[in-house]
Amino acid sequence: MAYYIVRAKPKPDRLNELKERLGRHAFVQMRPFGQALTRALNDARIQADGTAIWEEEDYCSPPLAEERAAVLDTYFEGITVERVQEGEGWKQIANLPRLGETNISEASY
């Protein structure tokens, strides 16, 4: 299994829907990635420029192929990944505000 830091620009017109679906655990049953994706998105952070950032575990090549097709491309654009050791991504972003607690229109672009 590999771990990645994921950076992506949330689509502002879809962010409330994403928050609502995460609140209903709508992605948890998606196999094989639903639980990990739900955990990661619930803990995602937001950078000052409005970029969402989180650590994700993944088995796919290319990384996040299934997650992008099923969920991520609906809610984010400009998705990039960088390989990290497990937990290192979360350490790097621990002090950033949570995506779910941020009004995306307040973030500076």
Residue positions per predicted region:
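Short S/T/G/P-rich N-terminal loop/turn motif that feeds into the first structured element of a domain
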Residues: 1-52, 57-70, 90-109
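Conserved short beta-strand edge segments in small beta-sheet-based binding/regulatory domains
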Residues: 33, 77-91
